[in-house]
Amino acid sequence: MIKQFHGAEKVNLKTQNLKKEVVRIFKKHGLSTDHAIISANALINAELVGAYGHGLSRLKMYCDRISKKVINPKPKIKVKKISQSISHIDANDSIGFVAADIAIKKAISNAKKTGIGLVAVKNSGHYGLSGYYAEQAVKKNLVTMIYTNAPPAIKDKLQKHRTVQLMSTSIDITDGS
């Protein structure tokens, strides 16, 4: 159950009811059922671990980006095998959760076969909490490093344009149990 305060009003929602509602909203904006479920799971996980800035507070942003055609709700995602260990994904402007889900599953599969799994993703959007994906690999007893980039967001007082990127990094290590 998610318990969170919003102003003076306390909101209690059962996670399954919340998931159904988030899936419904994503489907209303054109995502397939599978993509809506993947996206809802990632957003709700962020809420459950207390990373509210990567959770439901971003739902409207994703829906707006779909409406403005920044996110492609019906992407044709291509996975290219580079080697036994390395894959490349062209996410076709998909919602980032779906691209990240495919990427971590491919990385886990490659790592289980060869000892290492590297996956690069292009043409994808914001994918939420990096640790959500890293944790999936750690549960399979794999060391995980996830990196992403972002558009320039910070500028120095003397600069005219933003030049510093804010980059997310997640490194997770299993204890072997």
Regions found by a protein language model. Give the residues of each.
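Glycine-rich anion/phosphate-binding loop at the beta-strand->alpha-helix junction
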Residues: A40, L118-S177
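Short, well-structured alpha-helical segments
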Residues: T33-I44
